[in-house]
Structure formats: C-alpha cells, structure tokens
Amino acid sequence: MKVGIDAGGTLIKIIQEQDNQRTFKTELTKNIDQVVEWLNQQQIEKLCLTGGNAGVIAENINIPAQIFVEFDAASQGLGILLKEQGHDLADYIFANVGTGTSLHYFDGQSQRRVGGIGTGGGMIQGLGYLLSQITDYKQLTDMAQHGDRNTIDLKVRHIYKDTEPPIPGDLTAANFGHVLHHLDADFTPSNKLAAVIGVVGEVVTTMAITVAREFKTENIVYIGSSFHNNALLRKVVEDYTVLRGCKPYYVENGAFSGAIGALYLEK
C-alpha cells in the first residue's frame, strides 16, 4: 500500500493507493497522534508527506517517509485530478481554500505562488461560531445552505434602484452592508451563516480573478477542504467567477491534491 498525507493546520488529508484503487480519508489535525498510531500499524510500501504538520508525523512513525513542499505537492496532485476528470487547461490560477487561501499560477510546466489571504475555512468556522454558537463544521455548513443574504448584503442593484447600474447589479457592493436598512428583519442563524460564506467566497474569487488578469489567463481552479459539505461556497465562487468574466473549475476531491501530489513527486 502507498500512502500520501497532507497534514494541514485543521485537517489531515490521507490517500491510500493499492491495486490501482484510491481511497480518501480525513482526520482532524488535533487527532494527529491517532494518525501516527494508525500509520505504525500498517504495511506501507511508500509514504509521502506534505503540509505544515508533516514533520510532526515523520518524527513519530517507525517507517521512512519523504516530505515535500506543500505548494509543489498541491500543484502536482491537481494536475493529476484535472487530467482524470477531463479538464485540459494550458494554464490556470488555482485557489487552495483551506483554513486560509493560497493562490498559485500554473503556466503549463510549473507552479508559482502568487498570493494568499486569511479568508477561508477558518473564517467560516470562527466567525460562524461567533454568529451562531455552532462549533461543528457540518452542522454550520448544513444550516448555511438554506440562508438568504438579501437583507444582509448590499448589492449594486439596491443602490441603483431606478437607474441602470454601470456594473452588474448582482455584484455585492458591501458585505453585511444591508443590515442597518433592515433592523426589523429576522436575521436567522441560516441567513447570517450564508452571509459569512458569501463574503469568504467573494473575497477568494475577487483575489483569484485579480491574479488571473495579471497573468492573462481566464481559467481559475478552486480546490480545498472548505468546499467539503459546502455547496453554497462552491455556488458563490462559480457564479461570481462567471459574473466577473472568468471560467471557474471545481475539482472533485480537490482537497486531496497535496496528498496525491506528494505521492507522485520524486526526490
């Protein structure tokens, strides 16, 4: 069995390959000792690690492991997944939306990191908790899917009520900027959480589009653990990317790009 692991700040992503079959699993980083114990019980032919906590795992296992830079691993794994899922892109920006967000440009040969922002899954969980008192990520994202942002976010069309706006009316003019106009509204937890996911998705997309224009590509690929159980975030980034004139791509199992890539990089 071959194992690739991306040990991130919040989640540990694990892929196992055996008999041409690939299986995926995740574990919370706070349970890293359990992952180490599991690894020490397996018959592993090849073990490759990446991510901020890769060194912690390597120091506590009884089998040899190779460690790779997470940006290179993510790019390698993403290329594999894009090919497997039928996407033939000459170049692209990829946004890895984990606890925070890292932005990269792939020119057809190699990747380079071109930016990063603190907006991502950490904001969804942290700000989401402050607004709802919900700590469980699945419960939080489940609730957000049914939310309505209309009384919370100020859209361009809300400003240009009787006039044709100079930019698309569905663009957000101010996240949470409509709240004071609707103080009599019922701001349900679902609505507030949907607005949190909205601002995360729009900030990530805006930054991705900015660097895409800088590098003269229209292709933006979105990956990362923040999309898990979060159809709303995927819809926000896809719709907003199209609205801003670029082409969005979502990759199934994209959160495992680093784990897959580590397994296929060679030292």
Curated annotation (Swiss-Prot):
Source domain of life is Bacteria
Q: Where along the chain is ATP bound?
A: 6-13, 99, 121-125, 137, 225
Q: Residues in the active site?
A: 70
UniProt keyword annotations, A-Z = ATP-binding, Coenzyme A biosynthesis, Cytoplasm, Kinase, Nucleotide-binding, Transferase
Q: Does the keyword Transferase apply?
A: yes
**Catalysed reaction equations from the record:** (R)-pantothenate + ATP = (R)-4'-phosphopantothenate + ADP + H(+)
Q: Which SUPFAM superfamilies match?
A: Actin-like ATPase domain
Q: Which GO terms describe its biological process?
A: coenzyme A biosynthetic process
Subcellular location field: Cytoplasm
Recorded E.C. number(s)? Answer: 2.7.1.33
Q: What class of enzyme is it?
A: transferase
Q: Which GO terms describe its molecular function?
A: ATP binding; pantothenate kinase activity
Q: Which InterPro entries match?
A: ATPase_NBD, Type_II_PanK, Type_II_PanK_bac
* Pathway recorded for this protein: Cofactor biosynthesis; coenzyme A biosynthesis; CoA from (R)-pantothenate: step 1/5
Which Pfam family name is an example for this entry? Fumble
Query: Which cellular component, as a GO term, is one annotated location?
Result: cytosol
Q: What does this protein do?
A: Catalyzes the phosphorylation of pantothenate (Pan), the first step in CoA biosynthesis.
Q: Which family is it part of? A: Belongs to the type II pantothenate kinase family.
Cross-referenced HAMAP family, in alphabetical order?
Answer: Pantothen_kinase_2 (MF_01273)
Q: Which PANTHER family match?
A: 4'-PHOSPHOPANTETHEINE PHOSPHATASE, PANTOTHENATE KINASE
Q: What is this protein called?
A: Type II pantothenate kinase
